[in-house]
Amino acid sequence: MAGRVKWVTDIEKSVLINNFEKRGWVQVTENEDWNFYWMSVQTIRNVFSVETGYRLSDDQIVNHFPNHYELTRKDLMVKNIKRYRKELEKEGSPLAEKDENGKYLYLDFVPVTYMLPADYNLFVEEFRKSPSSTWIMKPCGKAQGKGIFLINKLSQIKKWSRDSKTSSFVSQSTKEAYVISLYINNPLLIGGRKFDLRLYVLVSTYRPLRCYMYKLGFCRFCTVKYTPSTSELDNMFVHLTNVAIQKHGEDYNHIHGGKWTVNNLRLYLESTRGREVTSKLFDEIHWIIVQSLKAVAPVMNNDKHCFECYGYDIIIDDKLKPWLIEVNASPSLTSSTANDRILKYNLINDTLNIAVPNGEIPDCKWNKSPPKEVLGNYEILYDEELAQGDGAERELRSRPGQPVGPRTGRSRDSGRNVLTTWK
């Protein structure tokens, strides 16, 4: 068995196990010597905890960064993006330019968001500026649409506060932290239904930042036609695209799973909105993903034993502006349809080809820069070393004349060096 990768996983999914077995890798237990561990976020917390005192050797790699939650917890993601904006502002970067109303021209890509209970007073102040607005509340550490609800009255928050057995939002209680975000109430609709994008982004290293976009993302549609009517605020089949919720709807389609490929979306938008604005939209999606990664890179523990495949959730509004909603550390590997199973099998296959070159025993000291021919359906989204090597002022894109962000960017390598674009 010498020379064969020994693998462990605590996530029993066929798309994972079939990929390991296809490579002739050998399954072992976590108590034996292993080279590759595809683990849950709970396990990664234990592996890297001070109490455990576990040290990974050079021939071991895992699929999460130790403090991935700086990006994948809703509250910390927003906190880091806000800090990133302030730092760019302090530097005088053109990226931090604002309009006459004080809104960021280029960095306004997450909905207005507050942390509860900490930011309750700030939220109330903002709410009173637009009392007819709708807000969406989400628990910071949950996924699959659990614990989410919409509100359009302060009294609803106060009632929730009482129901949560907390005496006051102003006091720091031990209750579960929530974020409350301005709800995008003008989403782009197709067939009258709301949808979002699930995009896969692989990060092999944060310093230098090197990330890849998977070309086979998809759209997730709601089963019930969208209405901003306040009478439907409680109907999650109208508002939340999560498959975990939509699959319980009467109109859920088990054949296509309420999903479209990103390529189908692109074709639809090119035919209804035009090729130029569609290209601009996808450039902007690239832009906000790179900026979100740049925002967390300084605080991320760039452990050489780690890589991570994130699930990015993006909503497009009716003006074709993309919004970053959240980033998932463990995007679902459950297959809801036959096409879903093929997509996720190929996603894992391509991820492993990049993370474990040639399927050989890992060496965490390698430069994490695989040859282009092994990328499969991934394409380089951003490579900090290449960007710096070519000069921070140069825009590396295959479609000239379509800048994203300020044209005069000179500070802090703006992150506009998108190496490839959606095909």
Swiss-Prot record:
GO terms for cellular component: ciliary basal body; cytoplasm; extracellular region; microtubule; motile cilium. PROSITE patterns: TTL. It catalyses: (L-glutamyl)(n)-gamma-L-glutamyl-L-glutamyl-[protein] + L-glutamate + ATP = (L-glutamyl)(n+1)-gamma-L-glutamyl-L-glutamyl-[protein] + ADP + phosphate + H(+). Its EC number is 6.3.2.-. Its main location: cytoplasm. Mg(2+) 2 binds at E326, N328. The record marks Q144 as: Essential for specifying alpha-elongation versus initiation step of the polyglutamylase activity. SUPFAM superfamilies: Glutathione synthetase ATP-binding domain-like. L-glutamate binds at R220, K259, K344. The keyword Lipid biosynthesis does not apply. Its cofactor is Mg(2+). A protein binds at Q144. Residues 1-367 form the TTL domain. It is found in: Cytoplasm, Cytoskeleton; Cytoplasm, Cytoskeleton, Cilium basal body; Cytoplasm, Cytoskeleton, Cilium axoneme; Cell projection, Cilium, Flagellum. ATP binds at K138, Q144, G145, S181, L182, Y183, I184, K194, F195, D196, T241, N242. It holds the Pfam family TTL. GO terms for biological process: axoneme assembly; cerebellar Purkinje cell differentiation; epithelial cilium movement involved in extracellular fluid movement; flagellated sperm motility; immune response in nasopharyngeal-associated lymphoid tissue; microtubule cytoskeleton organization; mucociliary clearance; protein modification process. GO terms for molecular function: ATP binding; metal ion binding; protein-glutamic acid ligase activity, elongating; tubulin binding; tubulin-glutamic acid ligase activity. The keyword Magnesium applies. Mg(2+) 1 binds at D313, E326. Keywords: ATP-binding, Cell projection, Cilium, Cytoplasm, Cytoskeleton, Flagellum, Ligase, Magnesium, Metal-binding, Microtubule, Nucleotide-binding. Catalytic subunit of a polyglutamylase complex which modifies tubulin, generating side chains of glutamate on the gamma-carboxyl group of specific glutamate residues within the C-terminal tail of tubulin. Probably involved in the side-chain elongation step of the polyglutamylation reaction rather than the initiation step. Modifies both alpha- and beta-tubulins with a preference for the alpha-tail. Belongs to the tubulin polyglutamylase family. PANTHER family: POLYGLUTAMYLASE COMPLEX SUBUNIT TTLL1, TUBULIN POLYGLUTAMYLASE. Part of the neuronal tubulin polyglutamylase complex which contains TPGS1, TPGS2, TTLL1, LRRC49 and NICN1. Interacts with PCM1, CSTPP1 and LRRC49. This is Polyglutamylase complex subunit TTLL1. The gene is Ttll1.
